[in-house]
Amino acid sequence: MKEIYAIFGGNFDPIHYGHITSAEKLSREISIKKIILLPNYGPPHRSKTKTSIIDRLKMIKFAIKDNKLFTISYLETKKNTTFYTIETLKKIRKKIGYLQPLCFIIGEDNLNNLNIWKDWKKILSLSHLLICPRIHIKKSNPKLKKWISDHTTKNSNLLHKKPFGFIFFSKMSMLNISSTAIRKSYYEGKSACGLLPSKIDKYILSKNLYKIYNQN
C-alpha cells in the first residue's frame, strides 16, 4: 500500500493539544506518513482572525518541534490574498503528483457546511476527505447527505490504494478542546496551560495575544 500524506488546515489561533493529539490519533488509525499543517491568513468563509500569522506560525513551530510526523505549508499565509481549498489542493497536487494518496482533514462540522466552499464537489478529484468526529454536531446537511453517502468508505485501505475520491469518517475519539475557549481564558486572565504546550502558554502571556477577546 502507498503511504498517505494528509493536509490539516485551520486558523490555529492558537494551536492546541486538540489539534496535535487528534492528528496523531488519525495517523495511527489509517497509517499517515506525513501531516502537513496548513495555517491560513484568514479563510474566506469565516471572519478574519485577530492574531497575526507570524505569531500563529511561531506557536505552531513550538507545538511540532521534534515531531517528525508534522511539517508546515506556507501556501495560505500571504496577506491580502483570498485562499480557497480547491486552489490550494491543485498547487499541492502539482508538487506531489497525482498518484500520491492525499487526505484533507476536516471536522464533521465543516463537512456539513462544505456546500458553501468554492467548487466543493471537485475536492474529491484531488484528495480524500478525512473526517474528525465532533461532539454535539448538528444533524447532517440534507443538501449533502446523498453526496456524502455516495463517496463514503469504511475501508481505510482504499485511502492507500487510491490517490483521491473517498470520504472516511474517523472512529477515534477526539479531545474536546476549543481555540475559542482558550482565547477567552486568556482574555479573562486565566492560563490554559493544560490545553496547549507550556512554551505556547508562555508565548501567549509574554505577548498578551488575547487581551482582546475574539469569539469567532
From Swiss-Prot:
GO biological process, alphabetically ordered: NAD biosynthetic process
Origin superkingdom: Bacteria
Database matches in Pfam families: CTP_transf_like
A GO molecular function held by the record: nicotinate-nucleotide adenylyltransferase activity
Alphabetic keyword roster: ATP-binding, NAD, Nucleotide-binding, Nucleotidyltransferase, Pyridine nucleotide biosynthesis, Transferase
EC number, UniProt record: 2.7.7.18
Pathway(s) where this gene product acts: Cofactor biosynthesis; NAD(+) biosynthesis; deamido-NAD(+) from nicotinate D-ribonucleotide: step 1/1
Substrates-to-products reaction catalysed: nicotinate beta-D-ribonucleotide + ATP + H(+) = deamido-NAD(+) + diphosphate
Keyword Transferase: yes
Protein role: Catalyzes the reversible adenylation of nicotinate mononucleotide (NaMN) to nicotinic acid adenine dinucleotide (NaAD).
Family: Belongs to the NadD family.
Classification via NCBIfam families: cyt_tran_rel, nicotinate (nicotinamide) nucleotide adenylyltransferase, PRK00071.1-1
Protein name, as recorded: Probable nicotinate-nucleotide adenylyltransferase
Organism: Buchnera aphidicola subsp. Schizaphis graminum (strain Sg)
Organism classification: Bacteria, Pseudomonadati, Pseudomonadota, Gammaproteobacteria, Enterobacterales
